[in-house]
């Protein structure tokens, strides 16, 4: 069993989020592993939530949110801070102990979804392999028109080249604003 978690090794605040990793044979006794992912690429200042699955070849396939935030105080309100924030979806592969980020990351960005959504709030991928053998991912995103969340569905033949399929659920305002994992 593998347990991944998010943490910031430098602070108690959201910032340079990393993925930690524990494994267990029985769910009672756990072994700590070194950090699986750190924000060490140009497109990320934090590695946020995602999904880990066993791929068709038996390796681990992980899709995670790469957060790039250059606001002075790590604020999500960048209009007043004159900063830059963008969230994209990335993949990594591994064998259970070592993981390698895909060199072509990010695999889903603003290029793959409709213009009515904002790249500042586009996160929390849920990844699976369908019965048809294709990869599917559901993410949440914020609409520009009303700042409410929506669930977006994407598909891929190879987990690298993704296409937007549909908005499968839209927030009507009765469930808060932007949705989270």
Explain the meaning of each model-derived region:
Residues 1-124, 128-181:
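Beta-rich carbohydrate-recognition and catalytic domains
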């Amino acid at each position: 069993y593998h347990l991944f978690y998010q943490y910031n090794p430098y602070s108690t605040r959201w910032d340079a989020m990393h993925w930690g990793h524990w494994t267990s044979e029985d769910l009672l006794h756990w072994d700590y592993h070194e950090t699986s992912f750190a924000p060490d690429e140009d497109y990320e200042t934090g590695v946020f939530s995602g999904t880990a699955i066993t791929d068709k070849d038996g390796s681990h396939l992980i899709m995670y949110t790469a957060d790039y935030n250059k606001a002075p105080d790590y604020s999500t309100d960048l209009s007043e801070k004159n900063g830059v924030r963008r969230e994209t979806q990335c993949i990594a592969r591994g064998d259970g102990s070592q993981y390698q980020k895909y060199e072509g990351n990010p695999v889903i960005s603003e290029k793959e979804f409709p213009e009515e959504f904002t790249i500042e709030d586009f996160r929390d991928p849920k990844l699976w392999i369908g019965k048809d053998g294709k990869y599917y991912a559901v993410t949440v995103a914020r609409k520009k028109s009303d700042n409410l969340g929506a669930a977006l569905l994407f598909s891929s033949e190879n987990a690298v080249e993704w296409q937007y399929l549909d908005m499968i659920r839209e927030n009507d305002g009765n469930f808060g604003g932007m949705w989270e994992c």
